[in-house]
């Protein structure tokens, strides 16, 4: 994200260097391109800033969702005292792990609700947020309605059926979790595209002048 912000600052600098103040009188936050196009830098800069902040919020949500993959790797394992090494645990105590994942997806839903309140987001992005919310809700409904998962001694097999995307059986949340991942990926892609679109307002090429028709 820091690299992106640095690139934006450099872009703004290049715009200042490439624009001139000729032609009509300009306001303090305006510059004119050589073709006469007037850019409102304050407005465009805010648009870029808002888009970058929104994309960062989506990235935070994506990181939460992807963290479930790491948690799935700890199914059937326990921490070894002193060494901190993960070792096999044959006691099938995965209820706490399932509860943790449930909490993460619940938090994801709350954060998605917050994104819907952001001013100025496109209808396409709103649709993708709502799609992500529905996918998260479907996962939560699947998990909380399963007797095999809602207990302390949830088995390794059942836990994998729920939160391991590589599990061959599934049936307890895996399909819904994959759908949530896909929806969040699409939302992040759209958010990044919004940043690129905002930047392009600064970097759009100058319109070529049409050749004169007079002889």
From Swiss-Prot:
Q: Which residues form the signal peptide?
A: 1-18
- List lipidated residues, S-diacylglycerol cysteine: 19
Instruction: Give the UniProt keywords, A-Z.
Output: Cell outer membrane, Lipoprotein, Membrane, Palmitate, Plasmid, Signal
Name where it's found: Cell outer membrane
Q: How does it sit in the membrane?
A: Lipid-anchor
Q: Which family does it belong to?
A: Belongs to the variable small protein (Vsp) family.
Q: State the protein's purpose.
A: The Vlp and Vsp proteins are antigenically distinct proteins, only one vlp or vsp gene is transcriptionally active at any one time. Switching between these genes is a mechanism of host immune response evasion.
Q: What is this protein called?
A: Variable small protein 2
